[in-house]
Amino acid sequence: MKQVVLNIVIAFLWVLFQDEDEFKFTTFFAGFLIGLIVIYILHRFFGEEFYLKKIWVAIKFLAVYLYQLITSSISTINYILFKTNEVNPGLLTYETSLKSNWAITFLTILIIITPGSTVIRISKNTNKFFIHSIDVSEKDKENLLKSIKQYEDLILEVTR
């Protein structure tokens, strides 16, 4: 957060020194880019990672989630319309390595929002998720656990 504020301050200072008459967005943008370069060079002294890395991870996270949402929606629609007799609902467990409550809650929300699965319970001691899935055949079970692991890895990457 400090890096973002500092970058905006550098951009405004750049505008003040360059454009004395009026505010120009192009000058602000140039100052913002100069601020990015300065902060990238000095980010080791902040004791934090360069802030654009987290923004990139958030964009990557959004892309992965949208892909998972679309594919699981298509799969669920396929089960509802064409494979009603082949549905094999059931429970499965997933143990997470997430420690903070908000990260576990966020993972729970991602699982619930994704069609075809919902979290029934979370064990307090072991952080084990009990998940109901529309199909627990080996292939679909592996796909669901793989997507949950992918969500978990991205949450860990964002929170580092």
Curated annotation (Swiss-Prot):
Keyword tags: Antiport, Cell membrane, Ion transport, Membrane, Transmembrane, Transmembrane helix, Transport
Cell compartment(s), UniProt: Cell membrane
Cellular component GO terms held in the UniProt record: plasma membrane
UniProt keyword Transport, yes or no: yes
Residues spanning the membrane: 23-43, 55-75, 100-120
Pfam short name (any one): MNHE
Membrane topology summary: Multi-pass membrane protein
UniProt cross-references to InterPro entries, sorted A to Z: Cation_antiport_E
Record keyword 4Fe-4S present: no
GO molecular function: antiporter activity; monoatomic cation transmembrane transporter activity
Family that this chain belongs to: Belongs to the CPA3 antiporters (TC 2.A.63) subunit E family.
Subunit description: May form a heterooligomeric complex that consists of seven subunits: mnhA2, mnhB2, mnhC2, mnhD2, mnhE2, mnhF2 and mnhG2.
Stored NCBIfam families: PRK08965.1-1
PANTHER family to which the protein is assigned, alphabetical: NA(+)/H(+) ANTIPORTER SUBUNIT E1, NA(+)_H(+) ANTIPORTER SUBUNIT E1
Protein name: Putative antiporter subunit mnhE2
